[in-house]
Amino acid sequence: MKNARKIKDLLYEQVARIGKVFSSPKRLELIELLCQGEKRVETLASEASISVKLTSSHLRELRMAQLVETERQGKNIYYRLADKSVANLWVQIHMLAEERLVELQLALQKFVTQPDDLIPSDRDSLLKAARKGEVVVLDVRPADEYLNAHLPFARSIPLDELRQRLAELPKDRSIVAYCRGPYCLMAVDAVALLKQEGFTAIHLRDGIAEWEAAVSG
């Protein structure tokens, strides 16, 4: 075929656009945040701890790569993932990184992972126990993220409301807390608080993106 090299280079160049977008730590965090549901630029900037200007720049890159979409609602513009495949790719990338990178494994063990964390193979048993009411699955993300999507049988108590709402939780059953995913610390903080107050609490590293990827996979 004539110009075969030029054609091959063009094809790889286009695929590399996706890799380039995923090469930024902050864009990865924005993708994880958008896995929770659509959000305004200002909300994303606050949750990612960066300026609105820089957030807009990152979102522009994501949009150019067709990974996010926008919708105007009144005066506000909301961003969302283009489809579930973007969330699934994020899950596959961070799972590969956790498998291959010792530095990431050590960081997770030091800052995030707890000795009694539930592991992926526990999903079926967790679902059965939650269905029977033997455990309480607790979503500690903001309420709007819970309303967008949540794990089966989960109840919502955002982390910033947890201390005031402890009376709503039983002490005779284990509480399994989760948040946005394996790099989210809200569930870690929730488990620490619950244990301090005499509850039996366990950290589930999965977020909604990891759970849905496992179910669909």
Segments from the language model and where they lie:
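N-terminal helix-turn-helix DNA-binding core of bacterial DNA-binding proteins
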Residues: 13-51, 77-82
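Flexible, polar/low-complexity N-terminal or interdomain linker segments that lie immediately upstream
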Residues: 50, 80-136, 140-148
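Short, hydrophobic-biased segments on the C-terminal half of alpha helices
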Residues: 59-60
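Beta-hairpin "wing" of winged helix-turn-helix
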Residues: 63-73
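Catalytic cysteine-centered active loop of the rhodanese-like fold, especially the PTP/DSP P-loop
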Residues: 67, 169-212
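Positively charged, proline/Ser/Thr-rich regional signature most characteristic
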Residues: 125-189
